[in-house]
Amino acid sequence: MLQQKFPATAKSFFATHNFTKNLKQDFILSSSNEDEALQLYKQALFFSSNENIYYFPSYDTIPYDHTSPNANILSRRAEILTKLTTNNSNGKLLITYAANLLNKLPPKDFFSKYFLKLSPKMKFTTDELAMFLVENSFTRNASSIDVGEFAVRGEIIDIILPGPKAYRINFSWDYIESIKEFDIDTQISTKSCSELVISPANEIVLNSETNGNFKNNYLRNFGVNHTDNPLYEAVISGRKFAGYEQLLPLFYNSCSSLVDYLNDPIFIFDNLSKQAILEFEHSYNDFYSARSEVNKLKFNSFYPTLSPTDLYFTASEITELLEQKNNIFISYENSEQATLIENISSASFIEKKTVFDKLFEIIKAHSSKKIVIGAASLSGLERIKSITQNYEYKYNEINKLDEAKASVINVGIIPLNQSFYTKEYLFITASELLEEKSSSTNTNKKLKNILLELDNLAEGEFVVHKDHGIGQFLKLEALEIKGKLHDFLKILYAGNDKLYIPVENIEVIKKYGNDNAELDKLGSSSWQRSKAKLKNRIKEIALHLIQIAAKRKLNSSASVEFDLEEYDKFCANFPFSETEDQLTAINDIKEDLRNGMLMDRLICGDVGFGKTEVAMRAVFMVAKSLNEHLPQVAVVVPTTILCSQHFSRFIERFKGFGLNIKQLSSVISAKEAKIIRSELESGKINIIIGTHSLLHKNTKFFNLKLLIIDEEQHFGVGQKEFLKSLKSSSHVLAMSATPIPRTLQMSMTGLKELSIIATPPLNRLEVRTMVMPFDPVIIRDALLREHFRGGRSFYVVPRIKDIEDIEKQLKQIVPELSYKIAHGKMTPSKIDEVMSEFYAGKFDILVSTTIIESGIDIAEANTMVIHKADMLGLSQLYQLRGRIGRGKVRGYAYLTVASHKKMTSHSLRRLEIIQNSCALGSGFTIASHDMDLRGFGNLIGEEQSGQIKEVGTELYQEMLEEQIAIFKDEPIVSEQLFIPTINLGLSVFIPDNYISDSALKLGLYRRIGNLSNEIEVEKFKDEMIDRFGSLPIEFNNLLDIVKIKLLCFKLNIENLDSGDNGFVIKFYKNADMTDKILKFVSTYSNQAKIKPDNKLVYIKKLVDKNIIVEVNQLLWKLGGCRLDVIPNTSLRGAKRRGNLIK
């Protein structure tokens, strides 16, 4: 065994350097933890351009877990094992966490039989590819959005591979026409590929061979008592089951180690790696013992437990491999004078906050070397480039080390930990110069896409027709009209009456948004009376809202100016890099504060996504304003816990900036509160953070310039009235993950500015959410699982009276774990004491009511059980779940219910939404679902729903938008709007063999209903061709009819009918088209005439194949206009949602 000595920061450089010199040799670079392994891999990709450098990830689950690892990890591991198996021509460098060397994996030759290489022009069919994917653990869905999923649409197959990377394979008969990458969010293709290699989506491939192995090995290990075992039944049926990866050896006759996948590899390792191997062995033995103890209890699990020797190799077996003579053991040095292999040394002379004059002296001293400065983020890179230019040096931006040049400063986004130098290079990290932080690489879905996701419609939902009232959407149904099939929306009304709406007119119906609705009677006048009644009320609401907004805008405010250098210093103290959305929100606030009007903005961002930091930037700008005398900022929060947390954070962040910060809540004594109020009135306090205690008639401010309202949904009516009085002359910033429907609705009508923070922080994982009947086995497993990974758990009980029962259950289920209780009837000081102990890790489980909904931020607490979750509201559930998974560790939420049969449809719907809204950044979606469930609410009164129930949320929203636009004197289509009806005798529908999923098809129909001009129609058409292939004639007919309908709307044509001998046109009753009609009839007197009922008849022999051309020519002749000059106005007669968000 060779021993080498050099700085720890140069480990990846050393490994890639050795690999580059020995390209036929396999290497394994091991790390002491998973984060280091990933960092080493990223560094290796910079140091070398060799394609045979691989990273083998660890499971994100613990040994003997009953949940499956992340799909991306499963798929990535299988992909790497496939590459290691099939790439025999050259050497390989494998980077992995040392504990992975203990894993027992499928036999080495297994993956050589289960991969597929595709290329354009290759002979292959969609059926063959679909069969391969199913047999290799991929899941077939209507749309592919997650790793390991695929979708088949006619002659197109979409597939998501690790990364995630999405590919679209287009077939033509029995060969592959093209392979393209596509964007998962937009589903639009981006670039072509010459080759695609598809590996299994899991290390376990469910086929006849592996299922047979599983069945035999299962019986041999656990006997025949497997009846009614859902895991066993699922697997032998060829279906995946949560956590079945813990039984991997049962699927194969033999297993291999990771080392077996390489050819006599050289290990590069250190003492920490060896220690990690020993610790992991100790860990999985502990988990095995714990699992065995669980199985002895009466709560029998259907998860059998394999012994450690079945699942893992021993630490002694692996360490024996490490100590063989050709391997390289690394010891680290800290001294520049050490004797070093390859002349690598630490650059310890570069200290943090080195003045840049000293830096460039160092660069001059190493002028014979290539200088490389690595930044961790784009903002850091821009700062380094700017500084380099200021010192009159040339820079060369690089992505790989082999792009580095001499005599210039090479800069790039490079994941270096610390500075070091070699004989040829000097590597300097920007983090040591700028105190730079790693940034999140997650991309933000555009606001338009976030809003689009909300616009869904499901079978069985209540809908509202503008003319006929409330009905229930039953399904899409194809009807035969004049021998041609046409898709219709089938709507049920009272008395079992049915209304059929052609899909091209889908915009005439709106979502009602509430489960409990009474169906209207077709032809009844009661609907029109309800609508007219609400119209008058909406006028009052709209006028009041306009007056509020106008009053705020008339109250001009001096532009907020602050010291930029001091502000930059404040920003530099933020320990993370801002996400793209945070920067956007901060810039929005800057603009608001500088435009001379009072700000009124809502920040909607998921829990833990950085809203507080955005608020702190706003606080700094106002509190340090140069053109105000003693400006004050008030931060209002709903709970004492959140108040204490904010106070601590503000004190830490604003240290050294000369601002007096105080808190006011129930933990503050009456005497101290009186002093604080006095100092507020005199201007001695710059920033006050308070609960409802601050919203008191005795609270007076010297010069309140900014009011920040955190989690507004928790404040009562009286408190909101007091807040209103503060708002009238102050800048206002509201923050919430799930804002109350009223606040969100005001943002969506354009009366309150909206910023969305949808980009998760770096390495954030979504919380896995399970809705289930109470199961003591699963709950015990969940709580012990969290305990054994070194964490703590929340157990939320909605009602105080149920806490005693939960105590009894915990004593029985997990007697080995400790717990304490917190609820609203305890004194604030007692709650504070319990919370402090939980923060410190003095007990395992916090049993509490929903008082933890806001303000708890404990990185080690990542499991939550919610008792009787159906009793809680949607926003409450979302806020509670947001207490866990706030760091790099995955959170698990278990929403227990007594029985699905006992739940109302409303409760069941809430739980379905929270379970399905697992994606990071779902708060905006949750809030909008909340509006659907509760209604938008009366915007200016205390009533939550009122008369809105009579017309439904979407139509109410549209009527309000329209009335606001009228008062604001904005151009809008008249309320007496008509929807053109087009009957051309063509087949109009989306065929099942093109798109089979009815929900997806319905969503596309709704999008079609929102298309407002020819350009949008053509873009939509291009997207459909890209996603699903060439348009069938029936779908093409639909889009042609939409374009004709838009032109009819421009020409005030209410009905256009065709027959064998021509067209009949009926104009809208109030349309003034007399001159155009008379001119048209005069010009085409042989073909055109006006009937006694004022309909225009145009005689022309028609055939199907040219009817679209004929009707377009007719309309162009009639109107003398082109379609592309139609205003960008939807037929709904109101701005679309997406256009209302600024």
From Swiss-Prot:
Entry keyword DNA-binding: yes
PROSITE patterns with a match to the protein in the record: HELICASE_ATP_BIND_1, HELICASE_CTER
GO cellular component, one term: cytoplasm
E.C. number: 3.6.4.-
Cell compartments where the protein resides: Cytoplasm
UniProt KW keywords: ATP-binding, Cytoplasm, DNA damage, DNA repair, DNA-binding, Helicase, Hydrolase, Nucleotide-binding
Coiled coil: none
Main location (coarse class): cytoplasm
Domain Helicase C-terminal: 778-932
GO molecular function terms attached to this record: ATP binding; damaged DNA binding; DNA helicase activity; hydrolase activity
Motif (DEEQ box): 710-713
InterPro entries: CarD-like/TRCF_RID, CarD-like/TRCF_RID_sf, DEAD/DEAH_box_helicase_dom, Helicase_ATP-bd, Helicase_C-like, Mfd, P-loop_NTPase, RecG/Mfd
Gene Ontology BP annotations: regulation of DNA-templated transcription; transcription-coupled nucleotide-excision repair, DNA damage recognition
Protein role: Couples transcription and DNA repair by recognizing RNA polymerase (RNAP) stalled at DNA lesions. Mediates ATP-dependent release of RNAP and its truncated transcript from the DNA, and recruitment of nucleotide excision repair machinery to the damaged site.
HAMAP family per the UniProt record, alphabetical: TRCF
Protein name: Transcription-repair-coupling factor
